[in-house]
Swiss-Prot record:
Protein name: Microtubule-associated protein 70-1
Gene from which the chain derives: MAP70.1
Subcellular location: Cytoplasm, Cytoskeleton; Cytoplasm, Cytoskeleton, Phragmoplast; Cytoplasm, Cytoskeleton, Spindle
Any single biological process term in GO: plant-type cell wall biogenesis
Region (Disordered): 1-27, 388-512, 579-622
Compositionally biased residues, Polar residues: 400-425, 432-453, 594-605
Organism: Arabidopsis thaliana
Biased composition (Basic and acidic residues): 479-501, 579-591
Keywords, ordered alphabetically: Cell wall biogenesis/degradation, Coiled coil, Cytoplasm, Cytoskeleton, Microtubule
Length: 622
């Protein structure tokens, strides 16, 4: 694996093997936050002195696949998914538009049928009006016949009063045929009234039948609308089933991809373990440079503070010398000096506050480190549960191995964790110069093998860099204090013997980079396993939902078939009823026509008889 620099970059082989005494500081090392506030206007960051082309070549060598390409591929896949969703939404919109058009057509058909029914109602109303007019005409004829009868009786009375001779025939002989005719006319009038009543009853029954037919038509239309709705729902359910099947296929594909990614990650973890063994020495050298730089910054801060104190004391001495020859009223401190002393005291107060904040952050970082190492222990217990235990030889008096750092030291495994649990801090073992050069040359050999398969590890590497920067918003340069003591084994031994564990530097960034990366990769593997299990469970749930939807569709189709059969039966019964009503109407019309012809013949006979009677009367009077 590649060596991490202070700004998140990588070191070449020549730069990693250079001795410690470098005239220029490490490239692009930024000043710490507390020092930057005071000396930002006085000092600028040092320009890099290493070759940028060599760094770029080394980066391209280590990275087999570009993370930008991976991200672009992921974005293209997301765009394709969004396009697919958009096409599905367009298809649903088209289906809804078609259903709306069908509903509009059904509404238009219903309006046409209602218009036809209105026309039929108007025809029946016109027939009723014509029947009422006929009844009025019959009543008027009846009144006219009664008036003619009364007039005939009056004429007969006058004739009877005018008769004086006894030779004329009796009045009873003349009145008898007239009374018979009157009885016949009255009986005919009664028959006509009965016919009129029967016609009224028939019209009312026909109106009731028409209303029933309208109701049945409305119910049939409502059932047809229900059938259309059921068909639309069936189509929607079929579409949902297709969508669920497509989602199931997509989830299967994603599951296969995740399984392949997990296999790739396991392979990259193995290769990273091999590369981590060679990258520890270069990382330790980088830590040494960073620690030296931070110590130089602290020395400069102390020198600045001493210079400020010297200025303040010099100003005070000057004021005392100047006030020796003055009176008591004139001995006043100058405003400029007072402002400078006030600024100096405020700076010291701010430094004390910064120290308090740093101590709080150190305490928080220690707590977070404890949590992190406990989590690492859990992860390692889960991963190494089935593996055989490996015995590790402990080197006395903190001496380093001659063949380079072991895997446990570079990864930050169980050995260092046991020492951390017992002492509260991690002991570091720095390699000798010869092992340092050999390990730095082995970085390139391992990097060539790992660059081809290192596809998905860039995100975890970025996370490792973020963790290395510290939980309390430390700058990366503050980590130089912890790595400064690994410059030589003698100084580390003396400091470890003289200082108690409480005075040693806080293990905010004591762990090497490879250990963090290994833990992150282990976490990602566990998370991927959990996500694959959850996806399997979600696939099972979706299969169950698809089965439920299929059952619902079957029940709906059966219900639709039953409703369609009922509708067909009802429509056939309605057609039969309409045919019977038409036959009844035809018979009624024929009966009406025959009844209309019969009274006309009877009235003709009555008029002929009346005319004959009148002619007989005139003859008798003559």
């Amino acid at each position: 694996m590649s060596d991490v620099s202070a700004d998140g970059g990588f070191l070449s082989a020549e730069q990693a093997t250079t001795p410690v005494a470098i005239p220029t500081p490490y490239p692009s090392l930024t000043v710490s936050a507390s020092y930057k506030e005071k000396s930002s206007g006085r000092r600028r960051p040092v320009r890099p002195s290493f070759d940028a082309a060599a760094d770029n070549e080394f980066i391209t060598l280590l990275h087999g696949s570009d993370p930008v390409k991976v991200e672009l591929n992921r974005l293209e896949n997301e765009v394709r998914d969004k396009d697919r969703e958009l096409s599905e939404a367009n298809a649903e919109i088209k289906a809804l538009r078609l259903s709306e058009r069908q509903r509009e057509k059904a509404c238009e058909e219903l309006t046409d049928e209602l218009a036809k029914l209105d026309g039929k109602l108007k025809l029946t109303e016109s027939l009723l009006q014509s029947k009422n007019l006929e009844i009025k005409k019959i009543n008027e004829e009846k009144k006219a016949s009664m008036a003619a009868q009364f007039a005939a009786e009056a004429t007969l009375r006058r004739v009877h009063a005018a008769q004086k001779d006894d030779d004329m025939p009796p009045i009873e002989a003349i009145l008898a045929p007239l009374e018979a005719e009157l009885k016949l006319a009255r009986s005919e009038i009664g028959k006509l009234q009965e016919d009129n009543r029967a016609l009224d009853r028939l019209t009312k029954s026909k109106e009731a039948a028409l209303l029933d037919a309208e109701r049945t038509v409305e119910t049939a239309l409502a059932k047809a609308a229900l059938v259309d709705d059921l068909q639309n729902k069936n189509q929607e359910l079929m579409k949902q089933i297709e969508i669920c099947q497509e989602e199931n296929k997509i989830l299967d594909r994603m599951h296969r991809q995740k399984v392949a990614e997990v296999e790739k990650l396991t392979q990259t973890v193995r290769e990273l373990e091999e590369a981590v063994l060679a990258g520890g020495a270069a990382a330790n050298a980088v830590r040494d440079y960073q620690r030296k730089f931070q110590e130089m910054n602290e020395e400069r801060k102390t020198l600045d503070r001493e210079l400020a104190r010297a200025k303040v004391t010099a100003n005070r001495v000057a004021t005392v010398v100047a006030n020796e020859w003055k009176d008591g009223n004139d001995k006043v401190m100058p405003v400029k000096q007072w402002l400078e002393e006030r600024r100096f005291l405020q700076g010291e107060m701010q430094q004390l506050r910064d120290k308090l904040a740093i101590s709080d952050r150190a305490a928080k970082s220690e707590a977070q480190l404890k949590d992190k190492f406990q989590l690492r222990l859990r992860v390692l217990e889960e991963t190494l549960r089935g593996t055989s235990s490996i015995s590790i030889r402990n080197t006395p008096e903190g001496r380093s191995m001659s063949n380079g750092p072991s895997r446990r030291q570079s990864i930050g495994g169980s050995d260092n964790l046991q020492k951390f649990a017992s002492n509260g801090f991690l002991s570091k073992k720095t390699p000798m110069r010869n092992s340092f050069t050999s390990n730095s040359t082995s970085v390139l050999k391992n990097a060539k093998g790992t660059s081809k398969s290192f596809d998905g590890g860039t995100r975890s590497l970025d996370r490792g860099k973020a963790l290395l920067k510290g939980p309390g918003n430390y700058s990366f340069n503050k980590a130089c204090d912890e790595t400064k003591e690994s410059e030589s084994p003698n100084t580390w031994k003396e400091d470890s013997e003289e200082k108690p564990p409480s005075e040693l530097p806080a293990p905010a960034t004591e762990d090497n980079v490879p250990g963090v990366l290994y833990d992150l990769l282990q976490k990602e593997v566990v998370a991927l396993r959990k996500s694959s299990h959850e996806k399997d469970q979600s696939l099972k749930d979706k299969d169950d939902a698809i089965e439920m939807l299929a059952k619902k569709v079957e029940t709906l189709t059966k219900a639709m078939e039953v409703e369609a059969k009922k509708m067909r039966r009802e429509v056939a019964a309605m057609e039969k009823e309409v045919a019977a009503m038409r036959v009844d109407k035809d018979q009624d019309n024929r009966a009406k026509r025959s009844s209309n012809t019969k009274p006309s013949s009877n009235t003709a006979q009555i008029l002929a008889a009346r005319a004959a009677g009148r002619s007989g009367l005139t003859r008798s009077t003559q």
